[in-house]
Curated annotation (Swiss-Prot):
Sequence positions that bind substrate: K21, S94, M95, G96
Isomerase keyword on record: no
Presence of the UniProt keyword Cytoplasm in the record: yes
Keywords for the protein's UniProt record, in alphabetical order: Acetylation, Cytoplasm, Hydrolase, Protein phosphatase
Location in or out of the cell: Cytoplasm
Protein name (record): 14 kDa phosphohistidine phosphatase
Family to which this protein belongs: Belongs to the janus family.
Modified residues (N-acetylalanine): A2
Species of the source: Oryctolagus cuniculus
Entry GO terms, CC: cytosol
Active-site residue list: H53 (proton acceptor)
Function comment: Exhibits phosphohistidine phosphatase activity.
Reaction(s) catalysed (UniProt annotation): N(pros)-phospho-L-histidyl-[protein] + H2O = L-histidyl-[protein] + phosphate; N(tele)-phospho-L-histidyl-[protein] + H2O = L-histidyl-[protein] + phosphate
Length: 125
């Protein structure tokens, strides 16, 4: 049941164009009381409306907690999404949460956008 709940959460939800902040979030399934927790998945969320990385984390974690999931922010960065050129570049870091593991974020983005050129770098802010 818990795994089914996690499966319904999209791995990636990012805006379609522009440069914006993103966070990598680990979502934990709400375990049954007699079973140990342990099932989790990492998700990528990035939006232009967010002034701070915490704005994204607070909104997403609040929505998921209402469904019984625990969340932790693994870090953040920026995404440059050029849909016309079919390119996404992941880079930078979050002042509050630190640098996300961009290689993990990039793999998840590649799975959602298989016909895009998806790259990452640790440099930049």
């Amino acid at each position: 049941m818990a795994a089914a709940g996690l499966a319904q959460i999209p791995d990636v939800d990012i805006d379609s164009d522009g440069v914006f902040k993103y966070v990598l979030i680990r979502v934990h399934a709400a375990p049954p009381s007699e079973a140990p927790g342990g099932e989790s998945k990492d998700i990528v969320r990035g939006y232009k409306w967010a002034e701070y990385h915490a704005d994204i984390y607070d909104k997403v974690s609040g929505e998921l907690q209402k469904k019984g999931h625990d969340c932790e922010c693994l870090g953040g960065g920026r995404i440059s999404h050029q849909s016309q050129d079919r390119k996404i570049h992941v880079y930078g870091y979050s002042m509050g949460y630190g640098r996300a593991q961009h290689s993990v974020s990039t793999e998840k983005i590649r799975a959602k956008y298989p016909d895009y050129e998806v790259t990452w770098a640790d440099d930049g802010y």
